[in-house]
Amino acid sequence: MLNFISKPVGCLKGEITVPGDKSISHRSIIFGAIAIGTSVIDGFLDGEDCIATLKAFQSMGVRIEGPDKQRVIIHGVGKYGLKQPQNIIDCGNSGTSMRLLAGLLAAQQFDSQLTGDESLLKRPMLRISRPLSQMGADVTTQDGKPPIVIKGGKKLNGIHYVMPEASAQVKSCLLLAGMYAEGQTKITENAVSRDHTERMLRTFSYPVQIQDGAIIIDCNGECHGTRLNIPGDISSAAFFIVAASITPGSDVLIRNVGINPTRTGIIHILTEMGADIRVLNQRAYGEEPVADLHIRYSQLKGIDIPASMVPLAIDEFPVIFIAAACAQGKTTLHGAKELRLKESDRIGAMVDGLNQLGVHAEGFDDGILIEGGSIQGGEVNSRGDHRIAMSFAIAGAVASAPVTIKNCANVATSFPSFVTTANMLHFQIEEYS
């Protein structure tokens, strides 16, 4: 078992980049694989989750070179060129891989099966199997959870689906199926979710309409190979945005971070708490906005986080809770029940961990209350969740004594270079088995 020890430090200073965006990396493989022609992807995240997606397409006959220095070259086989995999597709820890692949595989002429690790096998899949079934797909789960068994050769029909809650994975799953369905597939969102799939469709020249909160797609298009530069992942940058905000005297610059407006909840929330974050040198990598982020220490104050921020910061809440633990006053969050359905129950994991470190935190069914103060040293269990592990590693920098974090191997799913990058900013994080 891989564990971390994170020791208290003085100020954090320096300039870093973070690995490529995980959401965009997954999608670059998917669309590159079903495109006509070759795609060259730079900035690809070679973490375990995205490699699971890459290997899935290799098992379906797609030739993919790399990753080599974050470059991947995909020799697309077109929409109808995928071949039946010889084995069950193992998605590892990656819910994105499983849910997006399910939408694509539901439209193929061959049978397939998707499985994953112990954590993934506990995650809800009815949210995709039900609408896929409405489209005519034959998709079965084990009591609503993986593994997923898909019978191919089914004729899909477009549907109008109103999203019951914000979920980029469900939306993307249905858009991928809609690329093969007869008639229009229309997806209406009542709350904004990540729009990387819609942007990626445009990048690969596939026609998609976006109007009045709805996304419309049909089968009368093709993806075409392209060149793509992936920005740094704001979900990875989040750890250092918070770290610089809560560590006195800190001054940190993070270059080339994706600032897609469906992902910048962390900047809005921390700014409302009093953080000193400047967004510099705004530009675009293709369809995706990018900037450099300059963060300096500032005393934070507790706030009531609006529920409207939940889909815009869903993956960043664990480290936002660390910021709340260092703020003056109380921070509350409601409307975030989805946090209990991630790689771990993130509300439960953070409440337990914060209490272990002397911070008063209470969990609700859909949120949390945190009383800011000081973080003590101690030991926490990440529950095998990469974002919990990294969040408590950040806490160690400002704790009164070292923080030991157990069960950290899954950090490799999203940020394999986390410890190296952190220590460039003068963190003192050590790994041990």
Swiss-Prot record:
Binding residue positions for phosphoenolpyruvate: 22, 95, 123, 169, 346, 387
Involved pathway(s): Metabolic intermediate biosynthesis; chorismate biosynthesis; chorismate from D-erythrose 4-phosphate and phosphoenolpyruvate: step 6/7
Binding site for 3-phosphoshikimate: 22-23, 27, 167, 169, 315, 342
One GO CC term on file: cytoplasm
Active site residues of this protein: 315 (proton acceptor)
UniProt keyword Nuclease present: no
Catalytic activity: 3-phosphoshikimate + phosphoenolpyruvate = 5-O-(1-carboxyvinyl)-3-phosphoshikimate + phosphate
Known EC number: 2.5.1.19
A Gene Ontology BP annotation from the UniProt entry: chorismate biosynthetic process
Broad EC category: transferase
Compartment annotation: Cytoplasm
Main location group: cytoplasm
UniProt xrefs under Gene3D superfamilies: Enolpyruvate transferase domain
MF (Gene Ontology): 3-phosphoshikimate 1-carboxyvinyltransferase activity
Record key words, sorted: Amino-acid biosynthesis, Aromatic amino acid biosynthesis, Cytoplasm, Transferase
Alphabetized Pfam families for the sequence: EPSP_synthase (PF00275)
PANTHER family: AROM/DEHYDROQUINATE SYNTHASE, PENTAFUNCTIONAL AROM POLYPEPTIDE
Function: Catalyzes the transfer of the enolpyruvyl moiety of phosphoenolpyruvate (PEP) to the 5-hydroxyl of shikimate-3-phosphate (S3P) to produce enolpyruvyl shikimate-3-phosphate and inorganic phosphate.
Binding partners and assembly: Monomer.
Similarity-based family: Belongs to the EPSP synthase family.
Protein name: 3-phosphoshikimate 1-carboxyvinyltransferase
Species of the source: Legionella pneumophila subsp. pneumophila (strain Philadelphia 1 / ATCC 33152 / DSM 7513)
